Amino acid sequence: MPAAPGWIASARRVPSTNFDARPAGVAIDLLVVHHISLPPGRFSGDAVERLFTNRLDPRADPSFEALRGLRVSAHFLIRRRGELLQFVATDDRAWHAGASRFMGRERCNDFSIGIELEGDGEHRFTEPQYRRLARLIERLRARHPLRWIAGHSDIAPGRKHDPGAFFDWGRLLALPEAGGLARPY
């Protein structure tokens, strides 16, 4: 069965309601790479899915209290073993970048696709994550006029620090599937 427009067939769908329509006529030309782990430093649970679908119980972990009432999402999450989850269709605007600026343009959510990597900024990302990210980039470039890639820290400096020092930009951009994207930082 083919995927619906804006959905990747190979991704596990976990639909979020934390999205809205992009402004008319805006080209989707930027990928934003993030990292996330909930609770911090722990991998493999379902807390990220629960956060992006407004089902995270703030009592489940002391660190979750700060997330109470937060309404956020990303288009994709890539787990440590390379599993791909999709929360929002790429044609829609996920709520991943917050207050942000890229090459003089404000509100990066309007023209970007947000990709979360399961990670915490303290550990290296995995080979399956890099491979899955490269394949995802290849698929997204077939649908959208993507030209740029940046980290959340690039578009929200001082406010955000992901994907962090352990993300190897050279390694990603050397993969053939990720070729053609520019990182102006």
What are these regions (language model features)?
Residues 1-106:
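N-terminal catalytic cores of peptidoglycan-degrading enzymes
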Residues 1-9, 24, 106-111, 120-185:
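Basic/polar, cationic surfaces and motifs that engage anionic cell-wall
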